[in-house]
Amino acid sequence: MIRLACIQIAPVFLDAKKTWEKLKEKIVEVKSNGAELVTWGETLIPGYPQWISPSGGAKFNNPQQKKAYAKYWQEALHLEESKIIEDMKTVAKKHKLMFMGGIIGAPSKN
C-alpha cells in the first residue's frame, strides 16, 4: 500500500517560484510523516485564474484580462527548461517520492 499525502495550500498568487518554495517545505514535512506519493490541487503553480468568474468569463479583448493572462502565461512552467521542474525532480529523487499535482505548463521556448 502507498501512503498518500494531499497538500492543500494557497499559492503565492502568480509567483511560480515562491509557490514552489512554499510547496517544497510542505513536501519535506509530509515525507517526514511517511508519505510516498504527494499530490496538490489544480493549477497550484502559479495559481488558479480566479479573475475569470467575477469578470463574467473569459473576455480576451478586455485590457485587464489581457494583462492578467500575460502574467499567468509568464509564470507558466516551460516543461523542458523550467528550473522549478528540475528542482521538483531533484526533490522527488532525494526523498524517494512520487508527485502528482497541478501546474500550468507551457511548451518549450525553443
Which residues does each predicted region cover?
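Extreme N-terminal starter segment of soluble prokaryotic enzymes
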Residues: 1-6
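Short polar catalytic/cofactor-binding loops
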Residues: 8-14
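Cys-nucleophile CN-hydrolase/nitrilase-fold catalytic domain and related Cys-dependent amidase chemistry
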Residues: 16, 28-110
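Short amphipathic alpha-helical segment that frequently serves as the phosphate-/nucleotide-binding helix
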Residues: 17-24
